[in-house]
UniProtKB/Swiss-Prot annotation:
Cofactor: Zn(2+)
Subunit structure: Consists of a catalytic RNA component and at least 4-5 protein subunits.
Catalytic activity: Endonucleolytic cleavage of RNA, removing 5'-extranucleotides from tRNA precursor
Keywords: Cytoplasm, Endonuclease, Hydrolase, Metal-binding, Nuclease, tRNA processing, Zinc
Pfam families linked: Rpr2
Organism: Methanoregula boonei (strain DSM 21154 / JCM 14090 / 6A8)
GO biological process entries: tRNA 5'-leader removal
Subcellular location: Cytoplasm
Cofactor note: Binds 1 zinc ion per subunit.
Residues that bind Zn(2+): C63, C66, C89, C92
A GO cellular component entry from the record: cytoplasm
One term of GO molecular function: zinc ion binding
Official protein name in the record: Ribonuclease P protein component 4
Lineage of source species: Archaea, Methanobacteriati, Methanobacteriota, Stenosarchaea group, Methanomicrobia
Length: 104
């Protein structure tokens, strides 16, 4: 079965929409964290449907296990180890590790 070709203008629009959803999630988090989680879920759906990667700066702002918007100190714990950073979502207790390169 052949893939349907999408117009080339859809991907930039999807990237822009994802950026808007993450900025809105950041603004509304302290008033209603549930809305922030919903905005992240919508951004992930757009990303999957349009096959657009979520930018690196946004990928670390949500839990990949439960799709919650993460804010350090509020619903996320950050621990720094040798060579990596451990981020724990306090909603689902899932830990994600990110590699950190040392600066000389």
């Amino acid at each position: 079965m052949k893939d349907k070709k999408r117009p080339p203008s859809v991907k930039p629009l999807a990237r822009e929409r994802i950026a808007v959803l993450f900025s809105e999630a950041e603004k509304i988090f302290h008033e209603n964290p549930g809305y922030s989680d919903r905005y992240v879920a919508l951004a992930r759906k757009i990303s999957m449907k349009e096959r657009v990667r979520i930018d690196h700066e946004y990928r670390r702002r949500f839990c990949h296990h439960c799709s919650r918007y993460l804010v350090p100190g509020a619903n996320m714990r950050v621990r720094v180890h040798h060579g990596w950073v451990a981020v724990t979502c306090l909603g689902c207790k899932k830990t994600t590790r990110y590699r950190v390169e040392r600066t000389p």
